[in-house]
């Protein structure tokens, strides 16, 4: 059986009229029989799609022909069956809701650490605060060993959690992480703007870490928002 290719991708970039992209996105993804969700907002694009390998690559070529998305990077995994039931393209206020409009990731990112570098830091025992920016129910499925978990129920609670815990992070090196990179990017920017000096974001999130390393230092599986539920370090649905 031919495996279904799954991609997760996002990019913070100004989109003046995101509603104008909805129909072209539906048409291009639909004609390739892709399923999943695409979120569009003035701050950018966030997508989770699945389908045949050539269809996925064809859609990405079409999307990257738009200069705004030319350098969009995708995280890949495979599954034995389609993990989504339908195709949705939605226009939102934010591609990841924080309810903090002053945070504009496209205006400048926090420093990022790539998967291989983080793997090396963890193996060396480097002093890090691994901060899980995901919801509590996601953390319960799996997280980095010893990670800090503020037990938030939704990402809009993250700014208050920073205010409540900021003193404990003073002088420490913080690596924010999440499923695919989008939440940890916003989180890292917020913390840096709040005055936390040494903040990194895990480039591409847990999924990219699994894709590019052996998953060392991560206990359990990564929760995903589709019918696969959770992926292990080999990016296979957890048994």
Swiss-Prot record:
EC number(s) reported in the record: 1.14.-.-
Swiss-Prot/TrEMBL GO biological process terms: tRNA modification
Annotated catalysed reactions: uridine(34) in tRNA + AH2 + O2 = 5-hydroxyuridine(34) in tRNA + A + H2O
The keyword tRNA processing is assigned to this record: yes
Keywords noted in UniProt: Oxidoreductase, tRNA processing
Catalytic residue list: 178 (cysteine persulfide intermediate)
Residue ranges of every copy of the Rhodanese domain listed in the record: 124-214
Family the entry assigns: Belongs to the TrhO family.
Role description: Catalyzes oxygen-dependent 5-hydroxyuridine (ho5U) modification at position 34 in tRNAs.
HAMAP family listed in its UniProt record: TrhO
Official protein name in the record: tRNA uridine(34) hydroxylase
Native source species: Bordetella parapertussis (strain 12822 / ATCC BAA-587 / NCTC 13253)
